[in-house]
Structure formats: structure tokens, C-alpha cells
Amino acid sequence: MSLTTAPVPGQAWAFRCDVSSAHNLLIAAIGIQLALMLPSLAAVVVDDRLLNGVSVWSKPLKFQASLIMMLGTLAILLPLIESAAKNGWGVWIACLVAAMTASGEILYITLQAARGRASHFNSETPIETLAYGLMGIGAALLVLSSLAIGLYLLMRPAADAPRGLQLGGGWGLVLGSILTLVTAFALGSGRIGGPGHWVGGVHSDADGLFLFGWSRSGGDLRVAHFFATHVMQALPILGVLLGAIAPRLMIPGLLAGGVFSIAVVVGTFVQAIMGRPFF
């Protein structure tokens, strides 16, 4: 941890976090994702082992790409928080939690792929049962750290922060985090359609939707979870576009975007629990 010191009355030294260290935590975590993505890309070509009908390396690659986007979003939005809050312990701890949980999650997922073992819904051994439980806790903490940074963006924005990106980023992180937690709980509980992401249909990803792998024979809880997670990117992009094209419509536009995002997540979730494929 990088710290700076500054004298205050009545004390020899006081400590405060250096915002660059918080930002560097996120960059380091992105570096870990990239470092694992390169061999995963090579492995998917040369390793013909399958899990649930698709390459064992399919899941690590999807998670590596998703976590790069999530951590990158936090890194981009972090400078929009006003200086006092940005240099405080709250933001630093949120970034530390995000970096550690994202790194731990992807290391385990990649390790399990290398072993040819499932990382999710795997209780075949005591260690894997424990690891899956810890991964669930880590994923929740990762999302909560994003929620915290979103609240900082909304409540303590920098005076010179671009309004569209600041509002879109703040609401995107808050709304996206809440929706992600709800869909992740439903997905991970195993109470809808049994353990796994399938609801009805063939319990295999072999003939899944191109690129995403979503079931085409029944419901798939991953669809709603995907849209929930990427609200964190969609609303900031919408905010930037509205700020550049129609500043007066920024707030109503973001509200409409938020309502639409909720509708998409709820709609695809209901579709999945009814056992219907996305396409």
C-alpha cells in the first residue's frame, strides 16, 4: 500500500491513502486477468478436453473478459470522485477488495479448467465445496465494492467531472450491482431448475448460442445475470452519449435507460425460469 504523510495539529504524522495506489490495485488486477487470458487463448486451441459439452477453457476466457471490463470500468470512473473522498480509506478498501476478489476468483476458475474440473456447482470433494463457497462470498464482495464506488460517484463527485459519465457511471454501478447480486443469488442457489444455469431443456452447453453459450433448448439463468452485470458499462456509455448529444435530456435519458435495464433483466429472468431460451 502506498501512503503519504502529512502533519496535523496535535500529532506528529497523519496517514492518508494515495489515490494512485487505489488505481494501481485495479490495474494490477487487470494485469492478472490479461496474464491468464493469453495462455487460456492458446489452450482453447490445443486442448480438446470438454466440460458441459464445450472447451474447458470457455469459462475462464468469459470470466477473464468480463472481469477486465468490470475492473476497467472502476479504473476509468475512479478519478471522477472528489479528491478528499478519493484519497480516503473507503475508496482504497473498495479497490483492494475488488482487486483481491477478482484475482482470487479468476485464479481458481483457471486452475480448475487446467485440471479439467468444474469451478461452479462442484461439490464432489470437500476442497471444491469449500472453494465454491468462498468464490461465492468473494463474488458478492466484488460486486459490493463496485456498489460502494458507485455511491461515492453519486454522493462525492469531483467538481470538474463530466456530468454524463459521472451520473451514468454512478447509477450504472449502483443499479448494475444490485441487479447482479439478485441474479447471482438466484443463479448460485441451485433452487431454480436444480444445480446449474439450465432450466429445462438439454443440460449441456454444446449447442448453445454462438459466443455466449446460452441454452437454445430451455431457459438459461446466465442471460439475466449477463445483462445485469453489464448495466455497469451500458449506463456510463449512455451518459457520455447524452452529455455530448443532448445534455438537457441527460437525466431523463438515464432514468429511461435504468428502467429499460431493469425491464431487460426482469424479462430475461422470467423467460429463463419459464424454461424458454433467449433465442
What are these regions (language model features)?
Residues 188-231:
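Membrane-interfacial catalytic/cofactor-binding modules of polytopic membrane enzymes
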Residues 25-45, 58-80, 94-113, 134-149, ...:
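Hydrophobic cores of alpha-helical transmembrane segments in multi-pass integral membrane proteins
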Residues 17-21, 82-91, 155-165, 245-250:
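Membrane-interface helix-boundary motifs at transmembrane edges
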